[in-house]
Amino acid sequence: MDPNCSCAAGGSYACAGSCKCKKCKCTSCKKSCCSCCPLGCAKCAQGCIRKGASEKCSCCA
C-alpha cells in the first residue's frame, strides 16, 4: 500500500491514449497519475505503475 495512493500495489490503473498527466487516473483510488512517467518524476503521482523509459510521456519528457 502506497501512502500517497490509497490502492494496493499492483492495483488497477488506467491511462488515456496519449497519456497526459491530467487525463491519467488510478481507477481504484481516483488520484491523478501518469503510468508512463519514469520513476522519480515529481510531476506525477507517486506509487503508480510506470512503463519503460522508452515510453516516456510528454508531461515528464
UniProtKB/Swiss-Prot annotation:
Keyword Cytoplasm: no
UniProt-annotated binding residues for a divalent metal cation 3: 15, 19, 24, 29
Keyword line: Acetylation, Metal-binding, Metal-thiolate cluster
Region (Alpha): 30-61
GO molecular-function term, one example from the UniProt record: metal ion binding
Amino-acid positions noted as binding a divalent metal cation 6 in the UniProt annotation, renumbered to this chain: 37, 41, 44, 60
Aminoacyl-tRNA synthetase is among the record's keywords: no
UniProt binding sites for a divalent metal cation 7: 57, 59-60
Binding sites annotated in the UniProt record for a divalent metal cation 2: 7, 15, 26
Binding locations of a divalent metal cation 5: 34, 36-37
Family recorded in the similarity comment: Belongs to the metallothionein superfamily. Type 1 family.
Domain remarks: Class I metallothioneins contain 2 metal-binding domains: four divalent ions are chelated within cluster A of the alpha domain and are coordinated via cysteinyl thiolate bridges to 11 cysteine ligands. Cluster B, the corresponding region within the beta domain, can ligate three divalent ions to 9 cysteines.
UniProt xrefs under InterPro entries: Metalthion_dom_sf, Metalthion_dom_sf_vert, Metalthion_vert, TNFR/NGFR_Cys_rich_reg
A biological process from GO: cellular response to copper ion
Region (Beta), start-end ranges: 1-29
Gene Ontology CC: one annotated term: cytoplasm
Protein name: Metallothionein 1H-like protein 1
Organism of this sequence: Homo sapiens
Function: Metallothioneins have a high content of cysteine residues that bind various heavy metals; these proteins are transcriptionally regulated by both heavy metals and glucocorticoids.
Modified residues (N-acetylmethionine): 1
Residues annotated to bind a divalent metal cation 1: 5, 7, 21, 24
Binding annotation for a divalent metal cation 4: 33-34, 44, 48
One Pfam family, short name: Metallothio
